[in-house]
Amino acid sequence: MFYPDPFDVIIIGGGHAGTEAAMAAARMGQQTLLLTHNIDTLGQMSCNPAIGGIGKGHLVKEVDALGGLMAKAIDQAGIQFRILNASKGPAVRATRAQADRVLYRQAVRTALENQPNLMIFQQAVEDLIVENDRVVGAVTQMGLKFRAKAVVLTVGTFLDGKIHIGLDNYSGGRAGDPPSIPLSRRLRELPLRVGRLKTGTPPRIDARTIDFSVLAQQHGDNPMPVFSFMGNASQHPQQVPCYITHTNEKTHDVIRSNLDRSPMYAGVIEGVGPRYCPSIEDKVMRFADRNQHQIFLEPEGLTSNEIYPNGISTSLPFDVQMQIVRSMQGMENAKIVRPGYAIEYDFFDPRDLKPTLESKFIQGLFFAGQINGTTGYEEAAAQGLLAGLNAARLSDDKEGWAPARSQAYLGVLVDDLCTLGTKEPYRMFTSRAEYRLMLREDNADLRLTEIGRELGLVDDERWARFNEKLENIERERQRLKSTWVTPSAEAAAEVNAHLTAPLSREASGEDLLRRPEMTYEKLTTLTPFAPALTDEQAAEQVEIQVKYEGYIARQQDEIEKQLRNENTLLPATLDYRQVSGLSNEVIAKLNDHKPASIGQASRISGVTPAAISILLVWLKKQGMLRRSA
């Protein structure tokens, strides 16, 4: 039977991609349905209890700048907050927080249940309703059919998921959850390229069986960072430390002598694992010269005794896992409460997607999260938000939107996936962005909140706070530009005491702030330049904008040059065999990828600058050279 009411957008899956997709579509005023196999696991952290990190924290801030949920949820659930790369430049600084799993899940569910235009329904989805290459709905396990103008697939590792512990394996979406086999089979019938990937998780340890007294502690930062531009540290729950132990030669001997029982090394697992989050058996074999590896013991929550040993993800048999755990300092008597495992699952080639994350072959069908070959909660959340907002725009007969590489890490993520595809689980790093000086955590709102407002994602409260911040930045910069001190002035001695070279000519507040030894905090304690802004976010922007002004201007010039290529559109139906002068390799790659622009074509491996020149000349001759606004 059909459900009596139609929807604008259906989201299938309630993980980190699905929850952001559902919230985005509903915020934009579309009637949205979130279908999940279990309402109690909405926003579940399936692997490590943490949000953020290098590159990942940038994505969380961007999701927040567009009105998303993840940053707000972690501010309410984070039990240890740190700034990574704090001693380096602002472009690569990143926020990371340990999470209380239960508090995080509660924060996500509360937000979903209180979001207007959003209905949550518990049923596994087994089929899609596709008519004339357009998706028009979904069918659940009990045969109930829902109609919609757009469908977003955010099914994580559940598609034909297979869990491996040693040489034993069984079907599962993650430990304790069933896989989605009928939906996987249905998707394989569609004209989509499919592959297999693998990820893993470590065993969980009972904290009461660990001797923490012999281990080094790792505390969070003070003052505590916050993730959301709307957040503050008073929202954070109680803060707790993590602990550090190490593997040793005994650990490595145990692993080496049991490799024949590893599904990875025995050839049982076909899927490729994540390069930047390798299993402990991979680390021992790939880095044979290392006699130890650092392991972080991370609490899973304030009311849980479970400890997540970050760094020993494994699919070795349970008896070997016990030996590995007990070989490490402080863990000699440790007890495992959940075994580690590897999970293998279907993913779909993201090169078959438009930059909006809509399928090139099935109209109205969007893909987001691990189904696109990514790894990580943050990468999933960012894709979910993008897919959700574009599903909402499609259902409202509006053009899709995707950020450029120069606008957001989300733009880098989507362009990498849709242009290059991936053969291993894709993780975001700052090194993937060529314009990272512009794409900082601290300015995510300055880059994206105005766009979010135009798209209908940003509410009045966030918009008012954003405009107040902009005014504070502008007013303070004008104040510092127009406040001067001369070498002969009474205040010069006070200023000189903080400079490596004394004033030799008249200087404004901005001139002084450009000096490497001067900070905004120090400057605003000096008589001519006091008082400091009470708006800490605006104060941070003033300092960064002044200190890095020259570098930022240079990068802006580079972006404007590249924008010409990004805006030169390529016809979706163009058969590149018509273009004389292109090599067979280039023709094959362009026909395979079907890039949307010259910029995208130039990033395809094997497409040379000479080929781009030939293509531009041919387009001009044919009268097909078009540029977007």
From Swiss-Prot:
GO terms for molecular function: flavin adenine dinucleotide binding. It is found in: Cytoplasm. PROSITE patterns: GIDA_1, GIDA_2. Its cofactor is FAD. GO terms for biological process: tRNA methylation; tRNA wobble uridine modification. InterPro entries: FAD/NAD-bd_sf (IPR036188), GIDA_C_N (IPR049312), MnmG (IPR004416), MnmG-rel (IPR002218), MnmG-rel_CS (IPR020595), MnmG_C (IPR026904), MnmG_C_subdom (IPR047001), MnmG_C_subdom_sf (IPR044920). Keywords: Cytoplasm, FAD, Flavoprotein, NAD, tRNA processing. PANTHER family: GLUCOSE INHIBITED DIVISION PROTEIN A, PROTEIN MTO1 HOMOLOG, MITOCHONDRIAL. NAD-binding protein involved in the addition of a carboxymethylaminomethyl (cmnm) group at the wobble position (U34) of certain tRNAs, forming tRNA-cmnm(5)s(2)U34. Belongs to the MnmG family. Homodimer. Heterotetramer of two MnmE and two MnmG subunits. This is tRNA uridine 5-carboxymethylaminomethyl modification enzyme MnmG. The lineage of its organism: Bacteria, Pseudomonadati, Pseudomonadota, Gammaproteobacteria, Enterobacterales.
